Amino acid sequence: MSKKVLLGMSGGVDSTVSAMFLKEEGYEVEGLYMKLHSNPGYHEIHEARARKAADFLGIKLHVIDLQEIFNEKVFKPFVDTYAKGKTPNPCALCNRSLKFGEMLKFAYKIGADFVATGHYIKTDGKYFYEADDDTKDQSYFLFYVNKEILPRLLFPLGDRKKSEIKELAASINGLATFASQRESSEICFVETTYTDLLQDYVEVDKVGEVLDTSGKVVGEHKGYMHYTIGKRRGFSVNGAHDPHYVVSINPDKNQIIVGKKEDLACNSVVLNNLNLYSDEKSFDTTVKLRYRTKAIPCHVDIIDDKAHVTLKESVFGVAVGQAAVFYDGNKLLGGGWIEDN
């Protein structure tokens, strides 16, 4: 008897071709479209695409509404993190709670043996590994997935190139339209800018003071939630001739502190809410502090459920609230959330 796989289907080329690969490998495939955020127009388009793909491939498509859970687990933390002057990473939270949380629960319900997605990542059932296509690798966003479920996960695209996937889809009658769809690289529930979305829930536009690193008022800004660490535009600095960057944010006083690029240098971080795939308490490894950045050599000490990370070279513009993800070569070792820099 063939093994049953529940495949997350978004209506995009990656999940569509993943379904085709899984069928070719002999799996019994059923699709799942998850309604996450409350954007009817978005779902109308993407659910229709997912259904078109499922019909073409001859697989059953389930549709479930997860908006309430998404709001609690992803959207509210997104708003709260910005309100605290930090920079959130909603995709990592969504992957843990919904795409590999609620989806796995649904897989149990229908008797599926595995869960699959079109993510560009690899796994051997014990660890995650970076995808072969380093321009599309999504391992950074999956660091928070519970390690106990790795044996149940399949990623058909982990050893493929994105260009290969699009070329294959383009060559098949019935799938060519999926190859030509415009890709979305932004947060799926943010239609324009994150501040446009936030202003429906919190006061975003509120003029405040710009301070230099000595505490002197040197200008004004349009509201602290418009800024993230390292930003260099959108505020005034009286008499400045050189570029100034946001080096910290004080949400309680609606202030941003700015300085020169060297003031952004960071040599250590502290991480909380850890998700580690190793039990080691002190080790040397590498860490990525943002998506699509190089891994920095570091030393890690786990003390009282927090990771104290000493960087072996300076990194500029490290944002509190973002994910820090550990790698041993291309092997993902887990990570945590930047609490202090």
UniProtKB/Swiss-Prot annotation:
EC code(s) of this entry: 2.8.1.13
Cell compartments where the protein resides: Cytoplasm
Disulfide bonds: C94-C188
Binding site for ATP: G8, M9, S10, G11, G12, V13, D14, S15, M34, G118
Main location, first listed in the record: cytoplasm
One Gene Ontology term from the biological process aspect of the record: tRNA wobble position uridine thiolation
An MF annotation (GO) of this entry: ATP binding
Keywords associated with the record: ATP-binding, Cytoplasm, Disulfide bond, Nucleotide-binding, RNA-binding, Transferase, tRNA processing, tRNA-binding
Signal sequence segment: none
CDD domains in UniProt: MnmA_TRMU-like
Annotated region described as Interaction with tRNA, given as residue ranges: 136-138, 290-291
InterPro entries (UniProt xref): MnmA-like (IPR004506), MnmA-like_C (IPR046885), MnmA-like_central (IPR046884), MnmA-like_central_sf (IPR023382), Rossmann-like_a/b/a_fold (IPR014729)
Active site annotation, chain numbering: C94 (nucleophile), C188 (cysteine persulfide intermediate)
Pfam families, alphabetized: tRNA_Me_trans, tRNA_Me_trans_C, tRNA_Me_trans_M
GO cellular component, one term: cytoplasm
Swiss-Prot/TrEMBL site (Interaction with tRNA) positions: H119, Q322
Transmembrane stretches, start-end: none
Keyword NADP: no
Family stated for the protein in its record: Belongs to the MnmA/TRMU family.
Function: Catalyzes the 2-thiolation of uridine at the wobble position (U34) of tRNA, leading to the formation of s(2)U34.
UniProt protein name: tRNA-specific 2-thiouridylase MnmA
Source organism of the structure: Sulfurimonas denitrificans (strain ATCC 33889 / DSM 1251) (Thiomicrospira denitrificans (strain ATCC 33889 / DSM 1251))
Taxonomic classification: Bacteria, Pseudomonadati, Campylobacterota, Epsilonproteobacteria, Campylobacterales
